[in-house]
Amino acid sequence: MALVFRTVAQLAGVSLSLLGWVLSCLTNYLPHWKNLNLDLNEMENWTMGLWQTCVIQEEVGMQCKDFDSFLALPAELRVSRILMFLSNGLGFLGLLVSGFGLDCLRIGESQRDLKRRLLILGGILSWASGVTALVPVSWVAHKTVQEFWDENVPDFVPRWEFGEALFLGWFAGLSLLLGGCLLHCAACSSHAPLASGHYAVAQTQDHHQELETRNTNLKH
């Protein structure tokens, strides 16, 4: 039973971490962190991401323009770029490390403890990747809400709203956190069968020694 739980936890943890990493990469590059709908022209919509701003028109389609300067960006977008890059890198390392700790990859019976440590390290990296993905999307969402309800801005001025990439980033961060938790559960459960195995071997050896002692006494 413990073996089945460990295998399921490992596969589910790696799968969720992989899903979260892919979604965090998409969140990083999609230009849909903010949406702006113009009341005067309903056929024209604006979107903003970490790297570019796009305008969507029914006749022309989507046209995007990269930001000219990194320093000219708002603080939340500058920090979000760095954190999202960090999240993508940590998520990739977490997948790589935890992959070597899976039971389906045979690296020798004497290296069970090493595989357990790899799963723990992979879980920690997935956690870090999830946190560094949740922080930027939550920060941008918070600033968007503040600007939307800013009383100093006239009512006729269009306001930015949540884009699809923010929800994608939240889902990515939660998937990475849950994947890291499952990897830790798998690592903790992988220690118990090993200990019980050693106990069974020791108990068998004691039984053999007891039988040998009885046979010796009968001969005498």
Swiss-Prot record:
Is Transferase included in the keywords of this UniProt record? no
- Explain the purpose of this protein: Plays a major role in tight junction-specific obliteration of the intercellular space, through calcium-independent cell-adhesion activity.
| Species this chain originates from | Homo sapiens (Human)
Q: Name one Pfam family in it.
A: PMP22_Claudin
* GO CC annotations on file: bicellular tight junction; plasma membrane
**Gene (name only):** CLDN22
Q: Which residues lie on this side of the membrane: Extracellular?
A: 31-81, 139-164
Family indicated by similarity: Belongs to the claudin family.
According to UniProt, the name of this protein is: Claudin-22
In its UniProt record, a GO molecular function of this protein is:
identical protein binding
Q: What is the lineage of its organism?
A: Eukaryota, Metazoa, Chordata, Craniata, Vertebrata
One GO term of the biological process aspect? bicellular tight junction assembly
Q: Which UniProt keywords apply?
A: Cell junction, Cell membrane, Membrane, Tight junction, Transmembrane, Transmembrane helix
